[in-house]
């Protein structure tokens, strides 16, 4: 380690501290302090101020209601969509539905196999008799 790095850091930090000390922040004032004294307002100015405040309040509430309605519309469209399921039961049901909807197309090309309740057991009994 050289002495150049700590000395440059020290010089930089002293410069920052000097600049920070010379800066002064302005005090924040609330919006109520900037308003003139309500007793000093004329009746016409008071009505105009009240009308402006009511208009701003109504506009803000209208925007909030519109946003809520948009969110509800997005939420209802999501619930209306069909959820996909990849479990064995769901896949089996989908395949059964596909076969039942296809109707005669699959049945006309279907070659029956010799499986069922009589396929294995009856032959053994018939052979023994």
UniProtKB/Swiss-Prot annotation:
KW Secreted (keyword) present = yes
Please state the span of the N-terminal signal peptide per the UniProt entry. Answer: 1-25
- Which residues are annotated as modified residue Phenylalanine amide in the UniProt record? 120
InterPro entries, per the entry: Calcitonin-like, Calcitonin/adrenomedullin, Calcitonin_CS, Calcitonin_gene-rel_peptide, Calcitonin_peptide-like
Primary localization class, coarse:
secreted
Cellular component GO terms held in the UniProt record: extracellular space
Provide a Gene Ontology MF annotation, just one: calcitonin receptor binding
- Locations listed in the record: Secreted
Which positions are listed as propeptide? Answer: 26-81, 126-129
Q: Which UniProt keywords apply?
A: Amidation, Cleavage on pair of basic residues, Disulfide bond, Hormone, Secreted, Signal
User: Can you list the disulfide-bonded cysteine pairs?
Assistant: 85-90
| Highest taxon of source | Eukaryota
Output the GO biological process annotations, alphabetical, semicolon-separated.
adenylate cyclase-activating G protein-coupled receptor signaling pathway; regulation of cytosolic calcium ion concentration
Do the record's keywords include Chloroplast? no
Q: Which Gene3D superfamilies match?
A: 6.10.250.2190
Into which family does the record put it? Answer: Belongs to the calcitonin family.
Query: What function does this protein fulfil?
Result: CALCB/CGRP2 is a peptide hormone that induces vasodilation mediated by the CALCRL-RAMP1 receptor complex. Dilates a variety of vessels including the coronary, cerebral and systemic vasculature. Its abundance in the CNS also points toward a neurotransmitter or neuromodulator role.
PANTHER family in the cross-refs: CALCITONIN GENE-RELATED PEPTIDE 2, CALCITONIN-RELATED
Instruction: Tell me what this protein is called.
Output: Calcitonin gene-related peptide 2
